Design a protein with these regions (language model features):
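Catalytic cores and adjacent flexible loops of soluble metabolic enzymes
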Residues: 1-112, 116-286
Length: 286
């Protein structure tokens, strides 16, 4: 039975998509140990917008967040998302390198890198910056809809990505634009050109098709899927770990995630959401 593994997006893309990045460090800390023990490949924690949000609105130190969270998760790499060179504005390269070094020194283990144009030179300096800081690298192949973005285009981009010192690739569908039919041709194309480089799959539920696209990706060879934990899943966020894992099992695959360990996380963030809406119930023990 083929194993399907998962990377978690709850602490980054989940609340970025549904709570406008308003999850504070204090909201995260009670559940980190459970997240760490559930069997995820990695968990997303920060992106450039989260640094700005933490400083400008939440009045928090983002590097302190990284340190406090990663201290509680020794078994699972924390992952940051890097889509551009600037962090707080139009930053010089020296600031970019300092940002990468401080992120790694405070506990960030991996960097998932995008370039809006899937351009080799755009990828290259970001990959070099992550490697210099000592982080593992996951390179995004960003999906969109246009006459240019054909299977042949993604085959060529995948081959270019393999020329860089990366650990993994990720088919990234940030707009939730993939359909099951398009997934059926895209995934085999990328896998055929990725060789022995592992490939993850990341989509959103914006159109409601995200969970179905995940299942199509799994059936066509993807072994690592990005999911979120409810209530920070679905909608404009990523598919629910419960949904994807259950349906993967129904198709004959094995999930390595301990879903029972995740139930208290769901209860915790549901209570956090209710408190934010004014209902203010007591937070359940995690």
């Amino acid at each position: 039975m083929k194993e399907i593994r998962f990377s978690d997006t709850t602490l980054r893309d989940g609340h970025m998509s549904l709570w406008a990045s308003n999850m504070s460090t204090a909201m995260m800390l009670p559940i980190v140990e459970r997240l760490d023990g559930a069997g995820f490949e990695a968990f997303e924690l920060m992106s450039g917008s989260h640094f700005k949000k933490a400083v400008r609105e939440l009045k928090e130190d983002p590097f302190e967040r990284i340190r406090l969270v990663t201290e509680r998760a020794p078994n699972t790499p924390a992952r940051m998302i890097l889509g551009r060179i600037n962090v707080f504005g139009f930053d010089p390269m020296s600031m970019f390198r300092l940002f990468m070094r401080l992120s790694a020194e405070n506990g960030m283990g991996q960097c998932r890198i995008s370039d809006p144009w899937n351009a080799l030179e755009g990828w290259r300096f970001r990959v070099e910056g992550a490697r210099e800081a000592g982080m593992g690298v996951v390179l995004n192949l960003t999906y969109t809809l246009s006459p240019r973005h054909t299977d042949e285009y993604y085959a060529e981009r995948t081959r270019l990505a393999k020329t860089l010192p990366i650990d993994r690739m990720c088919i990234k569908d940030p707009g939730g634009l993939l359909t099951p039919e398009r997934t059926r041709s895209l995934v085999p194309t990328v896998l055929a050109n990725a060789g022995d480089t592992p490939v993850e799959f990341h989509t959103h539920c914006t159109t409601g098709l995200g969970p179905l696209c995940c299942l199509e990706a799994i059936q066509h060879g993807i072994e690592i899927v990005n999911t979120a934990i409810p209530p920070l899943a679905d909608g404009s966020s990523n598919p629910s770990i419960y949904n994807v894992a259950a349906n993967a099992r129904a198709l004959g695959f094995e999930s390595v995630i301990d879903e029972d360990a995740l139930r208290p996380i769901t209860r915790h963030f549901t209570a956090v959401a209710r408190r934010g809406s004014g209902e203010a119930p007591a937070l359940p023990p995690v």
